[in-house]
Amino acid sequence: NMTLLVFKALWGMSGGLEQQLEQIAAAGYDGVEAWAEGIMLQPGAFRRLVDSFHLKLVIAGPITLPAEIEPTLKHYAAFEPLKINIHSGRDSLTHDEGCAFFEQALKTEVAIGLPVSHETHRGRLLFTPWDTAFYLRQFPQLHITADYSHWVNVCERLPDDQHEALALANSRATHIHGRVGYEEGPQVPDPRAPEYAPHVAWHEQQWRDIKSARLAA
């Protein structure tokens, strides 16, 4: 069985933290996704504040170097989140360096006992469909946060030529960032504008395919 949980990111919101959480809860979201480096409270205090609004929690943040993985994931685990989302490595790392990164990340994921997903983010290891496919084939236990807006930006096209890579990525996605990208950036100026209808349709199809893959898992 699969339960779809919808989270609102604190990213881009204005006002104080309590006001933001109140707005998220009032809007009917299941939880909040918070960037760890922007949280001024201690993990326990932040967790209690989130709990007071009956919200679930996803913690997100960057990990660039393998040596940072264990201490950073242990810090994120102290927030007792439902899961952790990572901006992983750098796009300039070799495949050998990237493999060393994910090997350590998966080992630490087991140690902390919380699911970790690695975001398909520009500037990071999973910045293209083909690099992502390489790592997913190397590591069957690796899961991703699908933010394909970055891929459209990096590829400067809707990557329809990447059928195998997309199918593999969709089968390993356990978290989605519902953002629509285009050739010139990771965020279309207005998803309602007719010139971006193909981009919206393409992203929505990937999200449907991810849902189908999760239901079949």
Task: For every predicted segment, state its role.
Residues 164, 198-217:
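A short, acidic, amphipathic alpha-helical segment used as a generic capping/interface helix at domain edges
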Residues 1-77:
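N-terminal pre-domain/capping segments
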Residues 16-19, 64-71, 93-101, 127, ...:
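Alpha-helix N-cap and loop-to-helix initiation/capping positions
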Residues 57, 61-144:
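Active-site acidic/histidine proton-transfer and metal-coordination neighborhood
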Residues 111-193:
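Acidic/histidine-rich catalytic cores of soluble enzymes
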Residues 1-9, 32-34, 55-61, 82-86, ...:
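Hydrophobic faces of well-ordered beta-strands that scaffold small-molecule active sites
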Residues 44-54, 100-111, 165-168:
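Catalytic-core regions built around general acid/base machinery
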Residues 10-12, 36-40, 63-65, 88-92, ...:
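Active-site-proximal loop/turn and secondary-structure-junction residues that shape catalytic pockets
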